[in-house]
Regions:
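C-terminal substrate-binding/active-site "lid" region of AdoMet-derived donor-dependent transferases
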Residues: 259-362
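Conserved class I S-adenosyl-L-methionine
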Residues: 177-188
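Conserved beta-strand positions in the Rossmann-like core of class I SAM-dependent methyltransferases
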Residues: 181, 201-204
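S-adenosyl-L-methionine
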Residues: 210-252, 260-261
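Conserved SAM-binding loop of SAM-dependent methyltransferases across substrates and taxa
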Residues: 187-199
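Conserved acidic E/D residue at the C-terminus of a beta-strand in Rossmann-like folds
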Residues: 204-210
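Conserved alpha-helix/loop element of class I SAM-dependent methyltransferases that forms part
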Residues: 145-149, 163-179
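N-terminal auxiliary segments of SAM/dcSAM-dependent transferases
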Residues: 1-142
Length: 362
């Protein structure tokens, strides 16, 4: 792997940006994990008596929680990332209005109402990738309790119809048309929303969990206005797609088989290859985050080459799927030459990374 002086300088800048991306992502993940929320009285005191905005008050409380002082880059990662959400935007959603379930237990699964406390932080949308591949989180909060439908298996929450779910599916809902194949059932939000579209004629859902299918059919599907469009097949989604012929009647595919970008990695790589084979427009839940995750790995390989002096022997063993992917990326790139900042920047674009995953053995 060779770098011109200009390309090397840019790669070193990207290594620093990658570190910031990871640090702020880890910060928010910790806040989400502990369901960190600020005491409403504390926030109100900061706002009413000290002139803080709700956003500034939350930022102050985060600094206090971690015992840190945010640096200059926090304007992008915190100030511009935080947004007060309006509950009416979500309560007026057609699915939310139609599916009025407070508590249903069926076998080991339970449909219930989860909630965010006032000023509790959550990911409201997929990340936004800015210039030079800065990954800006999209973080929301409500100023009063906000309830949403969720599904748990025994005591573990499995999926939720929270603002993140609604916002991250908007693009796919807009693009779906004709005969649609949906990989993964979940709470049926995506099928419900596209079933309302006149240009969506038929919806086939692939879900391998028979208990989730039964729960959906018994409690959620009866609330669909266009039940006649819905067909559910119990099968493994990857196996089903791999058996499809090029002349399949599907016009569009939407894949939602993972909980996060790490969980998605292998499934996504398999599916983008199938997308190319079938030549069917396909969208993937959290695709921006998935590609950003792969971009981080590529930049990690740059770090190894430019700073640590790694060689082929450092990319042989793999303890995790991420390690395996990094190894594959290294061997796919080891003979490449980067001659300019522009070339390197284009190589790290979403389209370029997707082509790399399709064409190389990663």
């Amino acid at each position: 792997m060779k770098f011109s002086k200009e390309a090397k300088e840019y790669a070193l800048d990207l290594i620093n940006i990658r570190e910031n991306n990871i640090n702020y992502n880890d910060m928010y993940c910790e806040l989400f994990y502990y369901r960190f929320c600020n005491e409403k009285d504390d926030i109100n005191d900061l706002m009413l008596n000290q002139g803080y905005t709700s956003k500034d008050a939350i930022k102050y409380k985060i600094e206090d929680f971690f015992e840190i002082a945010f640096e200059e880059e926090s304007e992008i990662y915190v100030d511009e990332a935080l947004r007060e959400e309006k509950e009416d935007e979500y309560l007026s959603n057609p699915y939310v209005k139609a599916i009025n379930i407070s508590h249903v237990k069926q076998g080991k699964y339970t449909l219930f109402k989860d909630k965010y406390e006032p000023f509790e932080l959550f990911a409201r949308d997929d990340i936004k990738v800015l210039d030079n591949y800065i990954e800006q989180p999209q973080i929301g909060y409500f100023t009063k309790p906000f309830s949403f439908l969720a599904l748990k298996e025994r005591d573990v929450t499995w999926m939720s119809l929270n603002p993140n779910e609604i916002n991250t599916m908007k693009k796919g809902i807009e693009r779906a048309s004709g005969n649609v194949l949906v990989l993964g059932l979940g709470l049926g939000y995506f099928p419900f929303m596209i079933s309302l579209k006149d240009d969506v004629k038929d919806i086939t859902i692939i879900e391998r969990n028979k208990d989730v299918i039964a729960l959906f059919k018994d409690n959620i599907l009866p609330n669909f206005k266009h039940k006649e469009k819905i067909h559910i097949i119990q099968d493994d989604a990857i196996r089903y797609v791999q058996k499809l012929q090029k002349d399949t009647s599907f016009d569009y595919i939407f894949a939602d088989l993972w909980h996060n970008q790490e969980d998605a990695l292998r499934l996504y790589i398999t599916l983008v290859k199938e997308e190319r084979r079938l030549n069917i427009p396909t969208d993937y839940w959290l695709e921006t985050s998935i590609l950003a995750y792969v971009r981080r790995m590529i930049i990690f390989v740059f770090l190894g080459q430019l700073i640590e002096g790694t060689s082929d022997m450092d990319y042989v063993e793999a303890a995790t799927i991420e390690d395996s992917c990094i190894n594959g990326l290294y061997f796919a790139m080891k003979d490449m030459e980067f001659t300019s900042k522009k070339q390197l920047k284009e190589f790290l674009s979403d389209a370029s990374i997707k082509e790399l995953l399709i064409n190389e053995k990663i």
